[in-house]
């Protein structure tokens, strides 16, 4: 399988990160690789990986290339369990996706809600490692079953933020039938009283925090990127 676009995306994210150590740790976590697994593949000791992730060492271009290739090779040894889920997203952009970001640090649901001034309708403790902002109307009109996986970026442990929703039922039904489950679902521009009971029921069944917020979507993106990305 060809994953050059994946490698370029990961390298770019690490290089542009304000904390390269946290970025390295984040990508290792996304690929479910232990420090020992990665060290074995790179031919170095786990303590060296720890030094890079803690900031005691700064990654150069040569190390970054080896690091990313090692992650992809490890995933290949496991049948591309990680990358096969997200290749559709990486192949092209889609007009239904308004914004997408992977976080440098984990966001807890309560902290996430505070940042976007959201009200949580179902309460579950899930780690949030990114977000995708989705135009619900364009998603309904243009996304097929395979396209839906594009919404998850490089990890399903993210918040799916749906805009232009009327009751929230359609987004939650889509989540219900999908194999990948988000860490949270945000219904933008919708008052809590208008959320469909079935949407809330699905959130309870899937154990997903369901959140509503009414602040401007541009402000939401700016706040989330400033706080977590």
UniProtKB/Swiss-Prot annotation:
CDD domains per UniProt: HTH_XRE
The keyword Transcription regulation is assigned to this record: yes
Pfam family for this entry, one: HTH_3
DNA-binding region (UniProt annotation): 35-54
Domain HTH cro/C1-type: 24-78
Species of the source: Archaeoglobus fulgidus (strain ATCC 49558 / DSM 4304 / JCM 9628 / NBRC 100126 / VC-16)
Keyword Nucleus: no
SMART domains: HTH_XRE
Cysteine-cysteine disulfides: none
Keywords: DNA-binding, Transcription, Transcription regulation
Protein name (record): Uncharacterized HTH-type transcriptional regulator AF_2414
SUPFAM superfamilies for the chain: lambda repressor-like DNA-binding domains
One MF annotation (Gene Ontology) recorded for this entry: DNA binding
